[in-house]
Amino acid sequence: RAYQDGDDTLARRRQIVVDYLDTVPLAARPGMGEVHGLGDGLWAWYGRDFREVNRLLADNAEGAAAPTPEALQRQAEAFKQVLSLMIAQRRPSQHLLGDGTGLARLTDSYLRLMAEAGLIAPSLRDAALPLPLHLRPELPSTPRPDFVQRKATVALRTHISALLDVPRAYDLERLDLEAETSLDGEAQALASRLLAGLRTPAAAKAAGLFGPHMLDPGADPGPLIYSFTLFERGPQANLLRVQADNIDQPFDVNQGARLDLGSTAKLRTLVSYLELVAELHASWAGLSPAQLSALPNNPRDPLGAWARQYLLRAKDRRLAPMLEAAMERKYSANPGESFFTGGGLHQFENFERSRNSESMTVREGFKHSINLVFIRLMRDVVRHRMFGGASDAESLLKDPADPRRREMLERFADREGSAYLIRFYRKYQRQSAAGAEALLLRGLKPSAPRLASVLFTIEPEASEERLDELLTQRLGKGFAGSPRALRALRTTYAGLSLADRGYVARVHPLELWLVGYLRRHPGATLSEVLDASASERQEVYAWLFKTRHKSAQDKRLRELVELDAFAEVHRSWQRLGYPFESLTPSYASAIGASGDRPAALAELMGIIAGDGVRRPVQRVDALHFARDTPYETRLEPRDAGAEQVLPTEVAATVRRALVQVVQDGTARRLKGALVDANGRAIEIGGKTGTGDHRYGHNGRGGGAGAERKISRSATFVFTIGDRYFGTIMAYVNEPYAARYRFTSALPTQLLKSLGPQLLPVLERGGCGGD
């Protein structure tokens, strides 16, 4: 490129020098960032204006008129400062971040050398040498706003990092980038300030947070965490307007944790139920009565049986009336039944015990958040996935010769064996060989057969002398094993299968295998253990594959069929924004056992409020790079495309149920709480949920043992009018959780307090325009 204009490259070489001077790195300063180029360097380190310095140096150029003594002093100071920066670029941090004495000494030395070489006039040298180099003092540090005030900013920066695939904050900071966001700045600041203030009793009292099912009189509101997320439905995307919490840490409780949000899971369960009804309608609504009657009738699928009977009787076969009829199906609220689910027997309770004897519709159960109604509803959903539609699980369970049984039993053995190995690995992973052996034998009632079974599993090549040593150590000196007896023990127990050695030792055979494997492969990872144990996991369940154990097989096959049914439920939840890669395979998922995130619940509410359409969440309206430069670029979001993920009729049915929760259900304190500019009540819908996360275990004899309260949460996921939706949550973690008994009354009251303050700000800020 230097020769594009001919052989004379002087101009190009000068430009290269200018480009270098404009980009030379000159360390960094707090409050300013990295310093590049002489212009920024003069301002950052000496407080000088670049144009003024250039003018002074031009006035001193060769051929210029002789300066006055005052002008010479100014020119000398400017020249010395520029020269010092050119020297400092060798080691900018060393020269510019220290006390400056070394830099001054080097600069004076170069002034003398340049004068001797005739590069500068002696008068300029003599004027510059006495002048001190005063590096500009650091700017007074401005107090950084706390994390509460910067929460949305931090979340947006993280989002932008992901959009640009720039994972390091350091690299993001180096971009000349402005981001235009969908956040309403005034509403965001107001919400952050209000939530932060709730840590004081006075502010909590002013918001009405003390009272039944909220904060007890005298309770300390300080440990409570509040979060609030508000979206607005736009034409192409759901726009984030407010994202705030009062955690003074970078952690974002709206998106960063898996929380027990209690009965908000009933919303997901209701949607799954109505989706199934819509699927059955799509399959059967066009059939004649004779065709409907000819459909197979499985007594294990009550939902399919109801749908068939409804369509046989219905005069109006449209989907909307069928969904309304599905909301009127009745379930018992009786907690007396035990439910076999998730591989175990479970019992559940209602929050309102006065409802225990009632039988109520799905609509009433949702409105009043009755646990047992939704446990039974989830059971019907799962059973339909197990035995209804195209499922052939019934024949699998009935026919012992079905070849699929063997395949599924092998899958069960692999799954359950892996679960045991994971547990055993955690127990032994940090133990030495001797420590693992001692831990294994600690709970073992010693006998010669048991000890021999253990030894020849963990140490297959053990000698009879080693066996004698172990028996003497564990059985005492009274044991005197003859060589013949030791040989007999070795012959008998070393030759047993892994499962039989575990049976003799009264230790799970995979635990024995793991201790032996870790002895031979110290430091093995869990992944290596699982890879190495594939055949052993099948071997220890060999008894299960024998046809005489059909009842045991059926029990485990039902567990797997249920697991597959929950996998289908999980896929439907994920399609509607459920954020996790697994779902707890238990009816308890209907009341919150599987966890959720406030942001994910808000997305589900956006789908419901948007007539079943899933719109992308938009946090950033535009990214503007290098403004007012030749490289200026502006990027705006592409239309990601909305997707119809729920039938419109399903969304409308759920929306009506949500409104009834506020009109006459668990969130009725919000009825009429918000009004528009004309004084008309704004319609609010939502679902409440209270999560009480505890850890406990049974005591001796199956009685209640120790219990630890891990956390408590109360959540309200809501819609406001036709445009706004979101979540509001109160949360407290251990060690404070045991002090509080609040329910979802707390966040609903908080929304009642916040809403009238926030909505006018949002409307004034122009939110809501299409």
Where are the model-predicted features located?
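Acidic helix-start/capping segments at beta-turn-to-alpha-helix junctions
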Residues: 1, 38-41, 125-147, 177, ...
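Short, glycine/proline-biased beta-turn/loop segments that scaffold the active-site neighborhood
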Residues: 261-358, 498-523, 615-633
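Acidic/histidine-enriched alpha-helical segments
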Residues: 34-43, 59, 103-105, 116-135, ...
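A penicillin-recognizing enzyme superfamily signal
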Residues: 181-230, 238-255, 269, 313-327, ...
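Flexible glycine/proline-enriched surface loops and loop-helix/loop-strand junctions
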Residues: 1-3, 63-69, 90-96, 172-177, ...
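Non-catalytic, structured segments within soluble enzyme domains
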Residues: 1-196, 230, 378-380, 385-531, ...
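A generic secondary-structure signal for well-formed alpha-helical elements
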Residues: 24, 28, 49, 93, ...
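Active-site-adjacent bridging/hinge elements
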Residues: 53-54, 160-171, 235-250, 340-341, ...
